[in-house]
Design a protein with these regions (language model features):
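Positively charged n-region of N-terminal signal peptides that target proteins for export
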Residues: 1-5
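Feature marking well-ordered beta-strand scaffolds used for ligand recognition
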Residues: 25-433
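Bacterial N-terminal signal peptides
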Residues: 8-20
Length: 433
């Protein structure tokens, strides 16, 4: 969703500006409506986001609730690489890559004006390797995922952006910062809000594009430098985010199928995409308190799904972060079983589950880590946090946009709208297990 972000001021959503529009026109930069929404955001709010208190210390343990200037619990600060050292702009999404040859870990850092690549071999002193410029202008929404040592990058509100494909093995020989070019540009869509990849099958799902009614645009990326369109999921309209997996959960009817779990603005929508030419919607379920179904992630056993709603805090009277718990024992009948209410006041954005923990990027409240071992009874508990926006907590759009917790080293990388790359490491003994 296009959410206009203002520091300390009222939040205005693009949906409020375009109530009479279809989702496709509101998100398409080739329409007058989409252009108006983009101008409103870009002209009014990006400059204000750049002013934030950012610490510069490295290798600082969390002691008595602080690491340098940052509030924390059970998470140490390793380093901060500010936006000025990443190519400028504002931060957005982030992902990681581990070189299968050297074992080196790298951050892939989205920004309004491009994508930065950072060597994390020494996490207390990350090394900027260079920038892949945006294809056709700036965007506050850039997203990337990795498959077969290639990064696949999309951006919203840029009509000709398409999907950039970048061979990450090129980073092995970089000694000084470079300005890179993409290896391939897929032009089957222009803008896209997000991208998901099922690494097991080799299919990418570009979502919120100007095709497929805003639903998943499926691309075969098994040959990364030769992507080919494989299908569309358009039955339920605009999808904001998705997780697509080869299903191995409790519902025997769908085991072995490729299933997408879509956050579709006001529902959790589950789709069988095994046959890319003929996807089948399994279920579509709303929930009490829905304002904007944003993103979610499956537990490792694929029995439960944790969903974040991006607007329930700012529009509600209780501004605490909420996480919606779903029981997926039957994919045709998902059940919303409860809500976890965080002690922190903030909007949730992106979360990823690794083992028994959910790593949440919750804007002004920073990185929050939840123990999900009690998910069967909808009982979650916070075991750690690192607040990259120390100025305060509120249901506004500043701070942590996303995080990546899947490095074998145990470090977690966070991308802040105003802060840039923040590298941290949880200290509780069972982190990520």
């Amino acid at each position: 969703m296009k959410i206009v972000r203002m520091m300390g001021l009222a939040v205005l959503t693009a949906s409020a500006l375009v109530l009479s529009m279809t989702a496709a026109s509101a998100h398409d930069p080739d329409t007058a409506e989409g252009q108006a929404a983009a101008r409103t955001f870009m002209a009014d709010h990006i400059p204000a986001e750049r002013h934030a208190v950012t610490g510069t210390a490295a290798g600082v343990p969390c002691v008595n609730g602080k690491a340098d200037i940052y509030p924390c619990k059970n998470v140490d600060l390793l380093s901060v690489l500010p936006l000025s050292g990443l190519g400028g702009g504002n931060g957005n999404d982030i992902w990681g890559w581990t070189d299968p040859v050297s074992g080196k870990e790298y951050a892939i850092v989205g920004r309004t004006n491009g994508t930065a690549f950072v060597d994390l071999s020494t996490p207390t002193s990350p090394k900027f390797l260079g920038n892949l410029p945006s294809n056709g202008g700036s965007s506050s929404w850039r997203d990337m995922k990795v498959y077969k040592n290639h990064a696949f990058i999309v951006a919203d509100f840029i009509s000709g952006h398409g999907m950039q494909v970048f061979d990450l093995t090129r980073l092995r020989t970089v000694t000084t910062p470079q300005t890179f070019t993409a290896d391939t540009l897929y032009k089957g869509f222009g803008p896209a809000h997000n991208i998901a990849i099922n690494e097991e099958t080799g299919f990418a799902y570009a979502i919120g594009s100007n095709t497929c009614s805003g639903g998943p645009h499926i691309v075969n990326i098994q040959s990364p430098k030769a992507p080919v369109k494989a299908g569309c999921v358009s039955q339920d309209g605009y999808t904001h985010d998705t997780q697509c997996v080869v299903y191995r959960g409790p519902d025997a009817a769908y085991r072995g199928k490729e299933i997408c779990f879509n956050a579709n603005e006001d529902t959790l929508t589950i789709v069988d995409v095994t046959d890319k030419a003929r996807p089948v919607q399994i279920s579509r379920k709303g929930y009490s308190g829905a304002q904007y179904s944003h993103q979610g992630w499956l537990t490792d056993d694929q029995r439960y799904f944790l969903l974040d709603d991006e607007l329930d805090e700012s529009r509600g009277t209780d501004k605490r972060t909420k996480t919606y718990v779903w029981d997926l024992a039957k994919l045709s009948a998902p059940v919303h079983t409860g809500v976890y209410n965080s002690p922190a006041t903030a909007i949730d954005h992106n979360q990823y589950i690794k083992g028994r923990y959910s790593y949440q990027a919750n804007y002004q409240a920073g990185l929050r880590i939840l123990d999900v071992s009690g998910v069967a009874s909808a009982q979650l508990s916070e075991v750690g946090y690192f607040d990259i926006y120390p100025s305060g907590n509120a249901a506004n759009f500043n701070g942590a946009w996303s995080n990546y917790p899947y490095f074998s080293s145990g470090i977690v990388i966070v991308n802040g709208i105003e802060q840039g790359l923040v590298v941290v490491k949880p200290t509780f003994t069972t982190a990520g297990r």
